[in-house]
């Protein structure tokens, strides 16, 4: 027999961004609990609003499944003493199983007889198990927690009521001073308290009290209302998924409305208007069919349409105040030159242990020029890069960015253009922040990409130099994200730069020309390892997924060049299912293991054919020499193809040749031959890491 079960946790209003993660966590914890308790169940239906987290479990079994299992004990020779009596080992075993020696049987396993017992565990009724959900509720974790009254217990928000209803029966337990019941709360202003007769009444009963508990249903309603509004007014509305989810989790009874603002504010850059509407007020914005931003906003009220004119007027007043501030800052900022703003940066601290923003910009300018030349930027691009690096943080001291921090870079681009900077320079000022999120958009221009890498590397090296290295989940300055951004930009631009060389070159430049008492060389190895970890992170995010052993292999690429690593992984992944992949890798790894035994200088790898003692050596030598000239300019795909070609010759070579010959000259000659092949293989990484079956 099965019954529905409802669990609802009633809370004070939660922040919108934790509602969905919280209900997902609760669902997983409840599901795991039911499975651990051997309780069969049907569908789990979740409900979530700012004031409640709830789960309706359909077809919950009325008792645990009975468990019949067999337990293996000691070997028979240990279970019985010399007189055939039960030993202490046997008696202790059955006592631990809750049985007696009368329950023992013997079974043979791999030629040895062992003690076995069979035991049955009769399932408990579900009513006896469900009170343990108290521990599930209390074990939940949240990004921020609070305590209330005099309780030591902390939760996302104070708990005000709990429903635990098995069909029509309340399951009793308490958390702090809150005891389970069958009563829930309707909308804070429109609804009333409602008592449920049975669990399945939940959704309909709440809807009658102005609460749409189903998050998907609430979101669909908002979307439908806004789309209807847009159609009636011939608007285009960007229903941003993140904003839609946030608004959905701010309300229990959504009613969309629209208001207007003075068209004079359209003179302000639209990014400012959109930020004011979307990020600050949680409004959707609208465009004309021609794509022009319109002086209207769309909001969602947590309530019905009563007195909507007052709601609209209030929202218009709040937005107008924000836009008036923005208009003021926009015009006041233009009275200050870029040079004046840059001068102010000498008094703006980047970090008290590192120095000012002006000092950071000096370092970044040097790094950017070095990188720009390394990556082949044109003379004109290098000129733009120099100018961009001289000014790129100037907007941080403007009034607009002081009020709307999320517009840093965006306003820098706008103001730079207004003051006569070239489009390339202005764009780089904006792009140097990119990617803003881990998988966000990348700089589209080379100048912006170089400046972004230089700025991010400087930040990373600065904090490492003063010992502020990320550990565990502690990364207050987002250095992992910035390093990951470097890796993604290098990949996107196909720019080659070995990480160890990168660090050494940067340290030298800064030490010589912009020291500012920062020792970048102290943590050079740590920075290289940190970047390598971000390359691994990039691999983990790739689809189709790259095999872990392939990742391990290419991360040991001698040059530590991220772009080469990505290409090597692509090549190995393309061949991992080849019929000869196993044989090729086994042959090459044998070469690599012997090459590791080389104990002499390998800068001049010259093989002497006069020392060959068999035809297999000659055949391999001829094939390698034919390939050797091309491998320096080969692609990695061509290098792998060369290894495939050499594979049968390598196998024949090992069949006929003792590499570690007693004669030193012969041994060195053979190891040199293998070192040449090893160098081709090492261009792909350390193939010893590959697992082939």
Curated annotation (Swiss-Prot):
The lineage of its organism: Bacteria, Bacillati, Bacillota, Bacilli, Lactobacillales. The keyword Transcription does not apply. Tetramer of two alpha and two beta subunits. Keywords: Aminoacyl-tRNA synthetase, ATP-binding, Cytoplasm, Ligase, Nucleotide-binding, Protein biosynthesis. Its main location: cytoplasm. GO terms for molecular function: arginine-tRNA ligase activity; ATP binding; glycine-tRNA ligase activity. It is an enzyme of class 6 (ligase). It is found in: Cytoplasm. One of its GO terms (biological process) is arginyl-tRNA aminoacylation. The keyword Thylakoid does not apply. GO terms for cellular component: cytosol. It catalyses: tRNA(Gly) + glycine + ATP = glycyl-tRNA(Gly) + AMP + diphosphate. Its EC number is 6.1.1.14. Belongs to the class-II aminoacyl-tRNA synthetase family. This is Glycine--tRNA ligase beta subunit. It holds the Pfam family DALR_1.
């Amino acid at each position: 027999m099965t019954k529905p079960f409802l669990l609802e946790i009633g809370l004070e209003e939660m922040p919108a961004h934790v509602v969905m993660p919280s209900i997902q966590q609760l669902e997983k914890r409840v599901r795991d609990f039911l499975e651990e308790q051997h309780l069969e169940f049907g569908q789990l239906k979740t409900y979530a609003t700012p004031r409640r987290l709830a789960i309706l479990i359909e077809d919950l079994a009325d008792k645990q499944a009975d468990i019949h299992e067999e337990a293996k004990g000691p070997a028979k020779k240990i279970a019985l003493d010399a007189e055939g009596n039960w030993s202490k080992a046997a008696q202790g075993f059955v006592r631990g199983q809750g049985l007696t020696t009368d329950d023992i049987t013997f079974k043979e396993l791999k030629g040895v007889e062992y003690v076995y017992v069979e035991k049955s565990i009769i399932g408990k009724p579900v009513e006896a198990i469900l009170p343990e959900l108290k521990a599930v509720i209390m074990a939940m974790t949240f990004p921020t927690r609070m305590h209330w009254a005099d309780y030591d217990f902390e939760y996302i928000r104070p708990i005000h009521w709990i429903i635990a209803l098995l069909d029509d029966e309340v399951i009793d337990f308490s958390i702090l001073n809150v005891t389970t019941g069958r009563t829930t709360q309707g909308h804070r202003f429109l609804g009333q308290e409602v008592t449920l007769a049975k669990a399945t009444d939940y959704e309909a009963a709440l809807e009658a009290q102005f609460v749409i508990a189903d998050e998907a249903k609430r979101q669909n309603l908002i979307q439908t209302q806004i789309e209807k509004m847009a159609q009636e007014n011939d608007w285009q509305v960007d229903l941003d998924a993140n904003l839609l989810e946030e608004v959905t989790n701010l309300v229990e009874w959504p009613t969309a409305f629209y208001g207007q603002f003075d068209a004079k504010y359209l003179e302000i850059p639209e990014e400012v208007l959109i930020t004011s509407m979307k990020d600050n007020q949680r409004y959707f914005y609208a465009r004309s069919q021609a794509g022009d931003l319109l002086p209207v906003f769309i909001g969602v009220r947590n309530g019905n349409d009563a007195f909507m004119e007052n709601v609209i007027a209030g929202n218009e007043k709040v937005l107008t105040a924000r836009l008036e501030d923005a208009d003021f800052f926009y015009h006041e900022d233009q009275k200050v030159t870029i040079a004046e703003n840059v001068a102010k940066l000498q008094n703006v601290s980047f970090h008290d242990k590192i120095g000012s923003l002006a000092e950071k910009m000096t370092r970044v300018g040097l790094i950017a020029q070095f990188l720009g030349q390394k990556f082949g930027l044109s003379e004109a691009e290098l000129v733009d890069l120099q100018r961009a690096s001289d000014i790129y943080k100037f907007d941080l001291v403007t009034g607009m960015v002081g009020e709307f921090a999320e517009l840093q870079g965006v306003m820098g681009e706008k103001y730079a253009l207004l003051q006569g900077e070239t489009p390339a320079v202005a764009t780089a000022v904006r792009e140097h922040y990119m990617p803003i999120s881990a998988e966000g958009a990348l700089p589209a221009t080379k100048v912006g990409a170089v400046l972004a890498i230089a700025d991010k590397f400087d930040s990373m090296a600065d904090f490492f130099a003063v010992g502020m290295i990320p550990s565990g989940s502690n990364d207050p300055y987002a250095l992992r994200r910035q390093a990951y951004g470097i890796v993604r930009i290098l990949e996107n631009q196909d720019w080659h730069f070995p990480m160890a060389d990168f660090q050494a070159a940067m340290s030298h430049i800064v030490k010589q020309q912009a020291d500012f008492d920062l020792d970048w060389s102290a943590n050079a190895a740590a920075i290289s390892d940190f970047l390598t970890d971000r390359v691994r992170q990039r691999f983990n995010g790739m689809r189709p997924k790259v095999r872990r052993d392939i990742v391990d292999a290419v991360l040991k690429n001698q040059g530590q060049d991220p772009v080469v690593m990505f290409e090597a992984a692509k090549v190995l992944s393309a061949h991992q299912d080849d019929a000869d992949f196993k044989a090729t890798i086994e042959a090459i790894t044998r070469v690599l293991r012997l090459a590791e035994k080389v104990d002499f200088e390998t800068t001049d790898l010259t093989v002497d054919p006069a020392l060959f003692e068999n035809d297999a050596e000659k055949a391999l030598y001829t094939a390698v020499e034919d390939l050797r000239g091309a491998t320096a300019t080969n692609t990695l795909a061509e290098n792998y193809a060369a290894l495939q070609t050499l594979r049968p010759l390598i196998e024949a070579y090992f069949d006929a040749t003792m590499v570690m010959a007693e004669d030193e000259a012969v041994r060195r000659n053979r190891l040199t031959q293998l070192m040449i092949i090893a160098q081709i293989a090492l261009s792909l990484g350390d193939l010893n890491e590959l697992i082939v079956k």
